[in-house]
Amino acid sequence: MKRLWSAFIKLLVLAVIGGALLAAIAILAANRQLPSLDALTAFRHTPDYVPIGKIPRELTGAVVAIEDERFYVHDGIDYIGVVRAGVANLSDELSQGASTITMQVARNFYLSRDKTYTRKLYEVLLSYRIEKALTKDEILELYMNKIYLGQGAYGFADAARTYFGKRLDQLTLAECAMLAGLPKAPSANNPVANPRRARQRQVYILQRMLELGRISRGEYDGALLEPLRLR
């Protein structure tokens, strides 16, 4: 029995070492095939690109609160967020994702939507590379300009015009929260296609902003009372 146990331990150690070596080889191979970040630089010079300084803080605050509340402290992959999302999705709470804003930038610029281990590996490696090359505000800026938000709108400036007929600097807190709820499911959650779900998402985001100290109780109450006025 003792010999069998010893043999099992040896096989287990060999399996772990072998798995680690295979993982290292896969990572090295994937690293060599990663694209350059030139596409990000080029996109920042497109005519309709909106710099972060011209995006309302209420809007960036709402987006970070719902999409990636640890955005400014993680290195592209939020391991705490992965665990929290798993717990939330097993409970009765609104479902949460584990993709960070950086991972979404990597996916939106470079990758397909295929749910494969290879694509996920590229997404993780690209996220680390993006984090090393750009500041957090630059990454958030790219996200705010690129993300699809339903009704043919790409980026929050386009979405503000599409849904409310406004410029970004004209948005109210309630409208910012409404738009921030779109990235998760832009076709299903937008106020044109499904006002009830859009409202539910808006309220949840305002609650998160209040809990995180991004807005005051008065701002929260005022935003809840504001009627929805689409263009």
UniProtKB/Swiss-Prot annotation:
It is an enzyme of class 2 (transferase). The keyword NAD does not apply. Its main location: secreted. It is found in: Secreted; Membrane. Pathway: Cell wall biogenesis; peptidoglycan biosynthesis. The chain crosses the membrane at residues 8-28. It holds the Pfam family Transgly. It comes from the Bacteria. One of its GO terms (biological process) is peptidoglycan biosynthetic process. Keywords: Cell shape, Cell wall biogenesis/degradation, Membrane, Peptidoglycan synthesis, Secreted, Transferase, Transmembrane, Transmembrane helix. GO terms for molecular function: peptidoglycan glycosyltransferase activity. GO terms for cellular component: extracellular region; membrane; outer membrane-bounded periplasmic space. Its EC number is 2.4.2.-. Belongs to the glycosyltransferase 51 family. Cell wall formation. This is Putative transglycosylase H16_A0665. It comes from Cupriavidus necator (strain ATCC 17699 / DSM 428 / KCTC 22496 / NCIMB 10442 / H16 / Stanier 337) (Ralstonia eutropha).
